[in-house]
Amino acid sequence: MKNLILLLLFIPLISFSQDFRKMSFGQSVEELKETYPATEFTFEEENGVAIFSHEDFVGGIKTVVAYLFLDNSLKSGFYVYDEENYSKSSDDRYKDYKNISRFLNDKYKMKDDSTWHNDSYKNDSNSYSHAFAMGYVDFLETYRTEKVLIRHVLQKSDSSITHVLGYSNPEFAKQMYAESESDF
């Protein structure tokens, strides 16, 4: 989970009047529990960051839904898709990414910020799934405003595949990025 926390702290995430699943940034842990009284949360804390999570189905995919609090204030929320389904193929994970991407692009104007490590298939969208399976590309799309930062990621590292959609207060994301930079 530590690696997941680090990954998510590097990922700038969003804010609206209801920023993440009926919650607004700045709300407390108590308000989360009042909003979801029937939900049994898993709790983790590291370096002063409290994460409350539970499993759900989002977009038809088994998902860990997590709420990140700092000083009892909601700073970000994220979806970790199909985290423990190790048998799911790269092709199926890419299809999941595209399905979630369609939903996001219907609501927001997402910007493609993908990183190509080998651009052999970059101009052939019919081969993107293969390029991903080969480790040639990490898919990333973002949406930014003064109040909102959304980041949707599909990446492959060694034998692990990560698919995360995150929403965060942009000031918090900026702060976390600055702190991570000072660690190097």
Label each residue range with its predicted role.
Residues S15-Q18, N85-S87:
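A short, structure-level motif marking secondary-structure boundaries and short turns
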Residues S28-F184:
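A cross-family detector of function-defining hotspots
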Residues M1-L4, N72-S73:
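Short hydrophobic/aromatic-rich motifs at helix boundaries and adjacent loops
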Residues N3-F16:
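Sec-dependent N-terminal signal peptides
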Residues S17-G26:
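Cleaved targeting-peptide boundary
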Residues I5-L6, F20, G60, D92:
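Generic detector of short alpha-helix boundary/capping microenvironments
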